[in-house]
Amino acid sequence: MAKLQRKRSKALGSSLEMSQIMDAGTNKIKRRIRDLERLLKKKKDILPSTVIIEKERNLQALRLELQNNELKNKIKANAKKYHMVRFFEKKKALRKYNRLLKKIKESGADDKDLQQKLRATKIELCYVINFPKTEKYIALYPNDTPSTDPKGVELTNLRREQFLKLVAERMDANTLNVSFEEILKGKKLDEDSIGLTLSPDKDHEDGSQVSPTQDRKELDQVVGEDEKDDFFE
């Protein structure tokens, strides 16, 4: 009986330790992962099988938690970095939509050219709102300043078109995380929603890193000084 109680107490202590590590942040999780990896590498031949199983399970759980933490940190960093650009791109897309809607009402609903432009603007607005939180935001309305990295620009343009195509498909199928109608009501992506996802494109990731200066140029192209003042009020 006493032996069983000691086992339960040890298991409880191990669970409590894991819980504390999980809540301690990315750096502590990384340190614990390294400790467990070293332990299993050096003493796997002499450790009891029950201990090995427990440590391997802990290691697997910690690696998963590390991935989740790093993903959350990436989402948080992207949200902070691209919030202003996305804010003004949404504003610009809404203005385009309202202008086109007014023209259609004035000229009639049979104007196919205006209808196509209206659809394109709807797609753009859905793009801004549903763009994945885990990726560097690719501006819809970038500046025309000549780039020193033409290949990077080409890959970025391709990635943008891929997302626009996916948005159009999801919009037509009514499977967007946030629909066009919901966007007009002010809805955004839920906190636990990442947004749209495409298959990884490593060539793009390697070639499309944008400096803060380039990000700033994109923002300056999207908005004017008066609008920037509105944002900070």
Curated annotation (Swiss-Prot):
It comes from the Eukaryota. InterPro entries: Efg1 (IPR019310), EFG1_rRNA-proc (IPR050786). One of its GO terms (cellular component) is preribosome, small subunit precursor. Transmembrane segments: none annotated. The keyword rRNA processing applies. It is found in: Nucleus, Nucleolus. Residues 223-233 have a biased composition (Acidic residues). Disulfide bonds: none annotated. GO terms for biological process: maturation of SSU-rRNA from tricistronic rRNA transcript (SSU-rRNA, 5.8S rRNA, LSU-rRNA); nuclear RNA surveillance; re-entry into mitotic cell cycle after pheromone arrest. PANTHER family: RRNA-PROCESSING PROTEIN EFG1. Belongs to the EFG1 family. This is rRNA-processing protein EFG1. It comes from Saccharomyces cerevisiae (strain ATCC 204508 / S288c). The gene is EFG1.
